[in-house]
A protein has these predicted regions:
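Generic domain-boundary/flexible-linker signal
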Residues: 16, 28, 73, 103, ...
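Surface "functional belts" at beta-alpha junctions
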Residues: 24, 33, 91-129
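Short amphipathic alpha-helical segments
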Residues: 18-19, 76, 106, 128
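Stable alpha-helical structural segments in soluble proteins, enriched in small hydrophobic residues
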Residues: 48-52, 81, 87, 105
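DPxDG-like acidic metal-binding loop motif
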Residues: 61-97
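Short glycine-rich anion-binding loops that position phosphate/pyrophosphate groups of nucleotides
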Residues: 13, 67-68, 119-122
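Short amphipathic alpha-helical face segments that pack within enzyme cores
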Residues: 40-43, 79, 100
Length: 129
């Protein structure tokens, strides 16, 4: 089990950064995205590191959402995670955007949930958990 990790989601209209320490969420930030997703991500990560006095070598794994969603956001997130993993010898993993949304509501409950993202006027991504 991974105790210290970061989850990044740039696949939708907001950047979401979540940091867990000892398997408990200690930091969560949600920022509206317009343009310059990479700049917003890097500035947000830098702010988090400064605010929490975070030692990046303590991270066990980094997660990035892998879709469905905005291709450019997914590409920026994956590029950051892969670059970080190479320079810090850290594990990485992908996470469905729909699963990330669902997990924020489930909190280890046994309830079932539908996660839905509107893709276009008549098209939706749907997953059941």
């Amino acid at each position: 089990m991974y105790l210290n990790f970061i989850v990044l989601d740039l696949s939708l209209s907001h950047l979401v950064i979540l940091l867990a320490h000892n398997n408990k969420v200690v930091y969560k930030n949600k920022i509206a995205l317009k343009r310059d997703r990479a700049g917003i991500l890097f500035n947000s990560i830098q702010s988090m590191i400064s605010e929490l006095n975070l030692n990046l070598s303590d991270l066990d794994i980094l997660f990035s959402t892998i879709g469905p969603g905005n291709f450019n956001g997914i590409r920026v997130s994956l590029s950051f995670v892969k670059g970080f993993a190479i320079t810090h010898n850290t594990k990485i993993a992908g996470l469905s955007s729909l699963e990330a949304i669902s997990r924020s509501f489930l909190n280890n409950n046994e309830k079932k949930i539908f996660s839905i993202i509107k893709a276009s006027p008549n098209f939706y991504y749907i997953e059941f958990f």
